Structures are given as C-alpha cells and as structure tokens.
C-alpha cells in the first residue's frame, strides 16, 4: 500500500513537471501576459523599411541618434520593417545573407539600448500577394533562420508574421499557422503578432484563424479610412492617385465612422480575449496638414481609449513624422501623435 502511495506520488510529480514544462515550451506566461506586453508597446513608429542601410550602411539615413530621439519624443516602440526576400537566392534552404542580420541586429540593439520595445515585422506583402503558395517555402525558411538568430533577445522583441497578407483567408490562415509553430519552437516565451488579410483590415478580423492553447499573441490591424483622404495623390494607389483637395474635418459623422470601425475591432478583441495593436495608420503628405493633424490625433486617441498599442506609419520615407532632409521632426504630426502634457 505504501509502495502504491509512493508510486502515485512520483507519477503525480512527474505529471505536474511535464505539464509545467509543456506550458513553458508553448510560451505560457499567463493569459494576461500579452496584454501586459501590449501596454508596454504603447505608442510607436515604423522605421527603416525603405532605408538604403539594408544594402549599404554607409548610405544609412537612420542613425543611432534617431532611436534616442524617438524615445525622448515619447514613443515606446519601433516596428522594424524588414524585407528579407532580396537577401536570399532561391535555393533549398533560402540561406539569408549575413549582411541582413548585421543590419537587423544593429537596429534591434539600438532600440533596446534606448528602452524601446521592438516589433520585427516581416514586410514582404507584395511578393506574398503575387504568389502566396509559391513564396510560402521561402517565408517559412527565412522565418526559421530569423527566429533562431533572434532567440536570445529579451521579450521586449516581438515577431510579426507578415504585414498585410493580401490573399484569400483560407490560404493565409494555412500559411500563418505553419509559420507560428516555427517561431514558437525557437522562442517559447516570445509574443507573436498575427496579421489579418487584405491590408490588416478590421472587417477581416472575423476571417482570422487563431493558434490553439497559446495566449501569448497580439493581433495587428491597420487603419487608413477614409482611404480617399489618407491616400489622395499617392502614386501607388490606383484609385486615389489623381485625387486632391479632400479634407478631413472632425465632424460628428466623421468621428463616428472611426469609432464604429474601432468598436467592431474592440468587440472582436473582447470576444477572443486577445489584445490589438494598430500597426499602421497615417495620412499621405498630399493631404492638407490641418486635416492630417486632426485625423492622426483622433485615430491615435481612439486607439488609446481602447487600450490598443499603436505604431504610426512612418518615421521616414513617406507619411513622415521626421524629415531626414532637414533632420528635424515634422512637429504638427509629432504633436498630433504625442500631445504635449
């Protein structure tokens, strides 16, 4: 009888150990951990996606000082926009050129040194849209390399699976659910950001498949509505490139339209018990500045009212909050994002 009791105790102890080990291996840090991470993300900005530093560090626009300036301005995170496909030749293993990792490490370390959270964003939506199944193997292989390379970074670094996956929901769900365990295997405690089809649009949250038994997840949405305002004059936007002079005034109807969209997202967030990050929002420079300021401020405040983190699009290149030519902030946009206390 005593032997049976001891044996049962050993079995119970082993079972408990295995349960704890398994939970740890799946990144289990408590169901509220992703919400804690999202709160820490706070306010942020997209950086370095179109900076020549990826190919030639001597031509970099982004410097170490800019990470410090971002933090001092009141931002809490940077979304590192990376496009790794061009750093690999099509092959069996899609080995990534070490030059890519040199730049990625530099950016991550500069951000962390300035106490900024980091979202490592896989920004290959154009290639994935053109041939999602044909590029799937490359996406999986490259994420495996990046996940292994970054596995020792602290939990202040997050992974985002693929920006704006413009494809059928069934195809994207299958791809995203193949990437997810690759990331989780090498990074059991890292928060992973999931993406939503067709521009990370709120209306497609309902189409998103979620991993089972893993709550260390944040879901990314993007917001550029009304698109005729935010993308007027944008040369890549076929329907809006010839538009001009469209203003955004904070009328009750205009504000209510944004609130209604955000309420749909918030309802989804509550129903699925997952936090949201507004990974992109902004109005292109061809819109008038007063309208851009009003819209940007309103969108940011509405996101914060729902406890979402956000990352403005973007620091440099277009939609800018920082002018590299003059090496100074675009103050109306910066102040719309981070109002004076």
List where the protein language model places each region.
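Bacterial N-terminal signal peptides
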Residues: 10-20
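N-terminal carbohydrate-binding accessory modules
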Residues: 25-77, 94-95, 268-269
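Surface-exposed, active-site-proximal loop segments in enzymatic domains
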Residues: 53-58, 84-101, 123-138, 291, ...
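Acidic/histidine-rich helix-loop elements
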Residues: 47-62, 84-97, 230-257
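Active-site region of glycoside hydrolase catalytic domains
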Residues: 140-254, 259-283, 305-308
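Aromatic-rich peripheral "rim/lid" segments of glycoside hydrolase catalytic domains that contact
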Residues: 288-341
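An active-site-proximal structural segment forming one wall of the substrate-binding cleft
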Residues: 67-76, 95-122, 129-158, 174-186, ...
